């Protein structure tokens, strides 16, 4: 009873804090960037991380096993994973676009776990014999950490695609003002440039906007590649550890279970992303790789939630049913 009450308090504290963090982040983003608000945001994420950690430790002690036995616990752990990504970047003094993704993603997952699932699913589940293994912590934690990293990296790629394909992102050579300026240089007609003095001003403004968008695209691509590479590593470890665990439990490394199949498809898609991203011979490789990563975003949700909706296969223990 004491553990249940403590878990209830910790989940509501973490959800309340991260909700305030989101409000502060929106104020800092939409109104005016204030350093004090930014510091409050980071402290709020640390408090949220501490509360979720306290919940996981409490659930671990009360249940006697690592809290990854049902969908509710896995969602809480996913929220914890998103929080730790945010905090690690903050500790290393990285100011990047992941902050705008990790905090909302954490509140979404925790909010769904707290309010979207039935009360019965909040209770710790008794592990079936096949799950009573030390591989539970290794396999499931690696998979959820990979989901968190891959989701963040994929969302950065989606943002990159949106910015790239905006109608107003036509580069210098497609702009009429830049064409006029180019014409003046090509024909050496400096008088034309003097008569059209406003062209230089307009072109400079246009060049600045395009240069800013170019820098933003490169920044998003760089961080997307880093985070997806990390998530791909976790996913590989998770799949391999799951194969070893399956061999111990069922006598076979691979059974083409629905979740195993979709995990393999997800792994293949992100392997294609990494290959496309590293292959400099491909034209527009940034956009191509971002498109592949956006496909991976959908596959992650299918792999994580879709199989739970079906409630079939060896992984149906975490289903909604």
From Swiss-Prot:
GO terms for biological process: cytochrome complex assembly. It comes from the Eukaryota. It is found in: Plastid, Chloroplast thylakoid membrane. InterPro entries: Cyt_c_assembly (IPR002541), Cyt_c_biogenesis_CcsA (IPR017562), Cyt_c_biogenesis_CcsA/CcmC (IPR045062). Its main location: plastid. GO terms for cellular component: chloroplast thylakoid membrane; plasma membrane. Keywords: Chloroplast, Cytochrome c-type biogenesis, Membrane, Plastid, Thylakoid, Transmembrane, Transmembrane helix. GO terms for molecular function: heme binding. The chain crosses the membrane at residues 12-32, 45-62, 71-91, 98-117, 143-163, 227-247, 260-277, 292-312. Pfam families: Cytochrom_C_asm (PF01578). It is a multi-pass membrane protein. May interact with Ccs1. Required during biogenesis of c-type cytochromes (cytochrome c6 and cytochrome f) at the step of heme attachment. Belongs to the CcmF/CycK/Ccl1/NrfE/CcsA family. HAMAP family: CytC_CcsA. This is Cytochrome c biogenesis protein CcsA.
């Amino acid at each position: 009873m004491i553990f249940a009450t403590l878990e209830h308090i910790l989940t509501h504290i973490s959800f309340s804090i991260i909700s305030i963090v989101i409000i502060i982040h929106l104020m800092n983003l939409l109104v005016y960037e204030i350093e004090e608000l930014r510091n409050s945001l980071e402290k709020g994420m640390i408090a949220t991380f501490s509360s979720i950690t306290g919940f996981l430790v409490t659930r671990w002690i009360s249940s006697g096993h690592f809290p990854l036995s049902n969908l509710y616990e896995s969602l809480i752990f996913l929220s914890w994973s998103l929080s730790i990504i945010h905090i690690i970047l903050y500790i290393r003094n990285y100011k990047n676009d992941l902050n705008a993704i990790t905090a909302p993603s954490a509140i979404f997952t925790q909010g769904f776990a707290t309010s979207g699932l039935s009360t019965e699913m909040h209770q710790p589940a008794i592990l079936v014999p096949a799950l009573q293994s030390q591989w539970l912590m290794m396999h499931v934690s690696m998979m959820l950490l990979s989901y968190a990293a891959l989701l963040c990296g994929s969302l950065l790629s989606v943002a990159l695609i949106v910015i790239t394909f905006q109608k107003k992102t036509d580069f210098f050579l497609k702009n009429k003002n830049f064409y006029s300026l180019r014409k003046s240089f090509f024909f050496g007609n400096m008088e034309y440039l003097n008569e059209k003095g406003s062209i230089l001003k307009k072109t400079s403004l246009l060049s600045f906007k395009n240069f800013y968008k170019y820098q933003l695209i490169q920044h998003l691509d760089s961080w997307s590649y880093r985070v997806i590479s990390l998530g791909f590593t976790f996913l590989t470890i998770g799949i391999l550890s799951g194969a070893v665990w399956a061999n111990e439990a069922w006598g076979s490394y691979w059974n083409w279970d629905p979740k195993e199949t979709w995990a393999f498809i997800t792994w293949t898609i992100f392997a294609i992303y990494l290959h496309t991203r590293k292959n400099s011979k491909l034209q527009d490789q940034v956009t191509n790789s971002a498109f592949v990563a956006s496909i991976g975003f959908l596959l992650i949700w299918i792999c994580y939630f879709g199989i739970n909706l079906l409630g079939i296969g060896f992984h149906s223990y975490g289903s909604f049913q």
